[in-house]
Amino acid sequence: MREIHNFLPISLANEIHDKLTSNEFPWFWLDDVTVSPEERSEVPDFYRSQPGMHHTAYRDGSGLSNWYGDFSFFYHYIIDALNLEWDQWYLSRIRCGLNFPTFREEHFLHNQPHVDFPESSQVDHFTCLYYVNNSDGPTVVFEEKEQSEKYTIKY
């Protein structure tokens, strides 16, 4: 895992923030940001649902949203930041997420452990997270790569 601070120039970071928080950007509701509705019944009761919003700007095989052009540059920045060969990697998905703050007495440090994009788990890949704000705390990464009875926090 690598953490890259100041990944974007400030002016570009501000532009992305303003687009995502404008009243023109289309967000779509998710009952739970960690699992699909079909998988929710498999989640232990102590991990309550974490609602949020999403917008998938690009998904391999599904096409582009009208906002794809506003986010497509991320791929090139990532390739450069990770020093990868551009012709050896391809883009699988660009997904914007907006998680809501969690206000519960039993608030955990993390949500249900999950894989962000299960379709990509069969091949070597990178998952890159870019935070526009800090509305719901840090992302937690676990040592375990398979479903487990107990999870160990890696980061």
Predicted feature residues:
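Non-heme Fe(II)/2-oxoglutarate
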Residues: 1-88
